[in-house]
Design a protein with these regions (language model features):
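Alpha-helical/coil-rich non-catalytic "connector" segments in signaling and regulatory proteins
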Residues: 1-104
Length: 104
């Protein structure tokens, strides 16, 4: 592995860590305002940030929704939304709850 590629890998890890911290801070603030539990997952179903226990949020739930043509979907108490940046799907947002507040 060349030095440049090692640096690039390290930089990507640092960027992902910073992005995860920013996302966590954002959803913590949103939860404080909305009182709704939120989770952000990457397209492989790995948790990026969350205000709730993962419990019944499976990898298959996240990856299946990410692969579907739907932009949002309600499955039980989970409200799933796709997060895009300039048209590229990056994350899946999960809001948990049965009240009207979840339909932010």
């Amino acid at each position: 592995m060349s030095r440049a590629s090692g640096y690039e890998i390290l930089q990507k890890g640092v960027d992902n860590m910073i992005t995860g911290q920013i996302i966590q801070t954002s959803i913590d603030e949103l939860k404080a305002i909305t009182k709704v539990d939120l989770g952000v997952y990457d397209l492989n179903g790995s948790e990026v940030a969350s205000t709730m226990e993962r419990d019944d949020i499976t990898t298959d739930l996240i990856t299946g929704f990410a692969a579907s043509p739907a932009d949002s979907q309600v499955i039980g108490v989970h409200h799933l939304l796709k997060i895009r940046d300039e048209g590229e799907l990056l994350y899946v947002l999960v809001a948990r709850g049965m009240t009207d507040d979840v339909y932010m």
